[in-house]
């Protein structure tokens, strides 16, 4: 009988960050980041047998709550359904690498407010000008950034290594940067079709929605394709959160997605941070008004910590919780997830230093981008002391 801390991801999953380092899943927090292996330098098999993963497997089998899984424990303790619980339901015991997800470098065409140069090439100059110039000379900074896409360059040893594991993989998950911009990702899908593996593989994407790929014909060969559009606001609020994106273009691409037939499912991936959580009722209202045929998933920003919705002051927390509880109970699908979000906030501990960082970061990047949080989010700006007098 499996223990109550058992997780399939410890045994049959790898999640690759933009720099090619891996962990068992995207929620895991490494306890020894300096010892991480890098894709392209060490094989996938070596990554699966990393010493830290060996300890995690032992803890999963003996009922120990491994500290690297803190994000799932926090969500479960708040009443939410964590990735651990969801994945345990979806997958039975398997052999080899079953679940592979990757943030495919930092190639991207927009500059999301909660992102950074490591995950978006569009952030590179702004990151240096506002922060990294204090740490690096420009030449050293460029060298530092290179490691956040090196593993996923076309000539990387990682790609043939991944090809050798396609026969056991049941689920591929691609993030960015912007995953639709990766040429090698499309080559991997074509190879899976050629080898006859595609019919047993599900593929999931999180996209910023600014592009709709020309290569969608390859999708029909796979067991299932799911595309989640990252929607962190509506209209001008979306464009603030997803800087350089155009809300009308994203709406047009969501309309295109509706014309695809067969095995494609579409959804909204709503990522909640201190910047936008107050406006979740408006986001949900737009979702049910215009996209009720889509799925939806509420995601949390765990880091950088100043964006984490568990650290807000008590007075702000009360106002936000009242807003979330005002969302109509008739929105049943959302209410299957909302209790976990509410519990996460309720169980959080205010962090005044991080909250001050949050407010300061808004000002720094507003100045750099010539944006104005108070103009786009006036109600919440007033609550947190950023409104114009």
Regions found by a protein language model. Name each.
Residues 1-9:
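Short, basic/aromatic recognition patches
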Residues 5, 29-32, 120:
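A short acidic/small-residue loop/turn micro-motif
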Residues 9, 23-27, 65-77, 107-117:
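Local cysteine-cluster metal-coordination motifs and their immediate loop/turn environment
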Residues 12-15, 51-62, 96-103:
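Short, intrinsically disordered, charge-biased short linear motifs at domain edges
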Residues 18-19, 204, 224-228, 246-388:
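Conserved C-terminal portion of the radical SAM core fold
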Residues 29-71:
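Membrane-interface junctions of multi-pass transporters
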Residues 68-98, 108-110, 131:
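Recognition helices and adjacent regulatory flanks at domain boundaries
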Residues 97-107, 118-154, 167-183, 195-213, ...:
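Core AdoMet radical
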């Amino acid at each position: 009988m499996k223990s109550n801390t058992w997780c399939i991801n410890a045994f049959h999953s790898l999640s690759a960050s933009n720099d090619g380092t891996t962990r068992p899943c995207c929620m895991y927090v490494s306890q020894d980041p300096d010892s991480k292996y890098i894709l392209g330098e060490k094989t996938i098999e070596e990554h699966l047998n990393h010493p830290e993963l060996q300890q995690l497997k032992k803890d999963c089998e003996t009922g120990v709550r491994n500290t690297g899984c803190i994000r799932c424990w926090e969500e479960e303790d708040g009443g939410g359904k964590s990735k651990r619980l969801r994945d345990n339901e979806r997958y039975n015991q398997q052999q080899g690498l079953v679940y592979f997800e990757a943030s495919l470098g930092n190639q991207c065409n927009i500059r999301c407010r909660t992102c950074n140069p490591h995950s978006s090439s569009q952030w590179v100059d702004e990151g240096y000008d506002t922060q990294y110039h204090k740490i690096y000379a420009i030449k050293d900074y460029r060298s530092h950034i290179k490691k956040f896409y090196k593993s996923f360059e076309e000539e990387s040893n990682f790609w043939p290594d991944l090809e050798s594991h396609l026969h056991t993989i049941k689920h591929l998950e691609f993030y960015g940067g912007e995953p639709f911009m990766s040429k090698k990702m499309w080559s991997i899908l074509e190879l899976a079709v050629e080898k006859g593996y595609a019919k047993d593989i599900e593929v999931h994407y999180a996209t910023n929605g600014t592009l709709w790929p020309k290569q969608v014909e390859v999708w029909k060969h796979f067991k299932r394709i799911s595309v989640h559009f990252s929607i962190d606001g509506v209209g001008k609020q979306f464009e603030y959160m997803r800087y350089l994106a155009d809300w009308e273009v994203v709406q047009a691409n969501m309309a295109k997605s509706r014309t695809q037939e067969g095995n494609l499912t579409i959804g909204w991936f709503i990522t909640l941070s201190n910047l936008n959580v107050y406006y979740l009722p408006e986001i949900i209202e737009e979702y049910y008004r215009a996209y009720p045929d889509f799925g939806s998933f509420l995601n949390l920003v765990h880091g950088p910590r100043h964006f984490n919705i568990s650290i807000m002051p008590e007075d702000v927390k009360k106002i936000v919780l009242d807003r979330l509880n005002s969302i109509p109970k008739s929105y049943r699908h959302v209410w299957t997830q909302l209790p976990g979000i509410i519990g996460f906030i309720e169980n959080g501990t205010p962090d005044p230093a991080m909250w001050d960082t949050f407010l300061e970061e808004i000002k720094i990047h507003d100045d750099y981008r010539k944006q104005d949080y108070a103009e786009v989010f006036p109600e919440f700006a007033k609550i947190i002391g950023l409104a114009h007098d």
